[in-house]
Amino acid sequence: MARYNRIKVVDVMTKNPLVMTPAETIGQADELMTENRIRQLPVVDEGALLGIITDRDIRSFLAQSALVEPEERAKVLRTNVREIMTAEPLTLAPDDDLREAIELLIEEKIGGIPVVDQAEGLVGIVTYVDVLRCFLNRLEEEQA
């Protein structure tokens, strides 16, 4: 069990994740998430992390407009990501322990955490799927 304590965020994170800019639309974010089967997208401007948008953010925002006319709904989908993103999200550093990432995912009930370098530039994202994949790989290695 002690060898699991040595796992770092960089060992499991998704490097160079798909991202959005603050000026892109909710519709574009929803489409990108659906096409790639992901649930969160970091929002960046020139490589600097500004926030994160999740499928939950989008569903919640769209639920507020569920009863509007189709033309209005189309307008809602053109809302900029910056309007509903979570600004200044929790972040991790590549050399943080995976245990810290897991604790944050559980305590905050979130699906992913952006990983930034010392200059606050986005270098990856660690999700609960990344964590599960890591442990599945370790289990398979132990059984081999």
Regions found by a protein language model. Give the residues of each.
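Short N-terminal signal/transit or membrane-insertion segments
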Residues: T14-M20, L49
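Tandem CBS (Bateman) regulatory domains
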Residues: M1-N16, T54-L90, D97, I102-E108, ...
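The conserved cystathionine-beta-synthase
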Residues: M20-R37, V44, M85, T91-K109, ...
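A glycine-centered beta-loop-beta connector
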Residues: M33, L41-D57, L105, I113-V129
